[in-house]
Amino acid sequence: RVLLIAYHYPPMHGSSGLQRTYRFAQYLREFGWQPAVLSIDPRAYQATSAGASPLDGVEVCRAFGMDAARQLSCFGHYPGFLARPDRWVSWWLGGVISGLKMISSFRPDVLWSTYPIATAHLIGHTLAQRSGLPWVADFRDPMAHDGYPEDAVTWQSFLRVEEKVFSVAAATTFTTGGALDFYRQRYQATHAKFHQIEN
């Protein structure tokens, strides 16, 4: 059994990131794994689609979380701490609480989280620390790298998330060889299990 932690999941509409988690949940079952999904409350999505349906037979838990830019701003402005490492950091607490309940009831053998969104890895990190379960951290894109994020404080917050990942995760996966090589060079002294799984 595997608990998938992902921001992008139906009924969200309009993001290519949906497909990776959706297909993981679909194909893991073909390899004998039973997946469940921990995601965010759909109110945090900018757009949803009634036609975007979760997989039948896959348990989905929606934890509280909001988009700081849309739901926590006043006249278009909001404090920076509400958006670090990203605008959905309010999902962390709800995700941890809901995730611990799912671990107790669903009893997964492994945790899996995917970036983007960085908060998904924060949830995965906390759940791995609290439960002792092995954790696989998936990177659809690199996090802190040259020129991204542009804001220096946000860049540092991304780097801190990375450091949490590579100090605790049992394995990491990447969509491209370039991203894998980038992180192997950065963290090879403390982390050995790098894998590439293309989209």
Please state what every model-predicted region is.
Residues R1-F64, A171, N199:
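N-terminal subdomain of nucleotide-sugar transferases
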Residues Y7, Y115-P116, F139-P142, E198-N199:
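Histidine-centered beta-alpha loop that forms part of the nucleotide-sugar donor binding/catalytic region
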Residues P10-M12, L100-K101, T119, L133-V153, ...:
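A short, histidine- and acid-enriched strand-loop-helix "catalytic/donor-clamping" loop
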Residues S73-G76, F106, D146-D151:
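Short acidic, glycine/proline-rich loop/turn micro-motifs
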Residues Y45, P85-I97, P108-S131, A137-F139:
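An aromatic- and histidine-rich active-site surface loop
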Residues S39, C61, P134, A144, ...:
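Donor nucleotide-sugar binding/catalytic pocket of nucleotide-sugar-dependent glycosyltransferases
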Residues V37-I103:
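A conserved catalytic-core segment of Leloir-type glycosyltransferases
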